[in-house]
Amino acid sequence: MEDSARLIVQYLHVLAGIMWIGAGFYTIFVQTPALMAAPPPARGAILATLAPRQVFYLLRLGEFTILTGFLRVLVSGRSREMSELGSRWSVSLAMGIVLTVALLGLGHAVLKPGVTRLLSLGPKAAQGDQAAAGEAAGIVARFKTLGYVQVALGLVIVGTMVVARLA
């Protein structure tokens, strides 16, 4: 039973991580360029439908990845090693945890309020409000930067998890 629990928790953790980091890749390299290629009048309707759903999805996947990661440590039987930070396993896992929590924190601090603000600016910008259009462009630029940060951190996090798995 113990092996089954470890296998299930590890599977869920890896699947959630792939979906979370993969969503970042998809957003930055496929979805955003496609959205920017759409005619400006169409962007608002697409964004209003897509953005809240996507933010919800990204944040829940990040939270589930972290939850299953902690469960994975508990069911691994190696949780005592985390207090020592003397092994390659514990150091790489600690690095991965810190980076993952930081990435989720960025999502909650930047992405969620930014999307809310962007959706409130959209109708004003569409009516010709230059200040709203400028602020919206700034938010989109921050989102693009955040997307690249998510991709980069995601690759580092995956690397730390591979090191931990092989340790």
PLM features: residue spans?
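Polytopic transmembrane helical bundles with strong interfacial aromatic enrichment
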Residues: 1-167
